[in-house]
Amino acid sequence: MSRKAREPILLPQGVEVSIQDDKIIVKGPKGSLTQKSVKEVEITLKDNSIFVHAAPHVVDRPSCMQGLYWALISNMVQGVHLGFEKRLEMIGVGFRASVQGAFLDLSIGVSHPTKIPIPSTLQVSVEKNTLISVKGLDKQLVGEFAASIRAKRPPEPYKGKGIRYENEYVRRKAGKAAKTGKK
């Protein structure tokens, strides 16, 4: 059993949770999220707290599902209350980004601009042409979209050029010995 799943999920002020047959709906000041539930876990709402327990009739995989659904519901509560944000930075000569309508337009050192469609539930903004901010309610969707941006030009280990997460450490490699003057 997950140790975190033993603790209740406390609901902040302004967040409402409703548990229907096979759905969990979390509403808050930033919006609402829905998650489908499974029969392996029992989710109960008591005194402004959510409890996630393994169902007593299931012996196959109860503990892993308990931890999974605890984390999913906890992320939903945090998402509708505060939201999630991933920031990326572009490092390289001529690298820049801009938001044009429903597309993120990237100039990343190829002959054509790269256009990435922005999901409707996310807000993407660009600061200083090289800092990209992805915001949204759903932690998984924010992370997936930020990872898809980073995958267009991951940072390379020699000069560090590419798209990286803010404060990400890129392990650098030494160049050829001939260039550094070593024998």
Swiss-Prot record:
Q: Name one Pfam family in it.
A: Ribosomal_L6
Q: Name one GO biological process term.
A: cytoplasmic translation
Question: Origin, by domain of life?
Answer: Bacteria
What GO molecular function terms would the record report? rRNA binding; structural constituent of ribosome
Task: Name the PROSITE patterns for this protein.
Answer: RIBOSOMAL_L6_1
GO CC terms in record: cytosolic large ribosomal subunit
Do you know which Gene3D superfamilies this protein is assigned to? Ribosomal protein L6, alpha-beta domain
Q: Its function?
A: This protein binds to the 23S rRNA, and is important in its secondary structure. It is located near the subunit interface in the base of the L7/L12 stalk, and near the tRNA binding site of the peptidyltransferase center.
> Partners and quaternary state?
Part of the 50S ribosomal subunit.
* Official protein name in the record: Large ribosomal subunit protein uL6
Originating organism? Chlamydia pneumoniae (Chlamydophila pneumoniae)
The gene that this protein is the product of is rplF
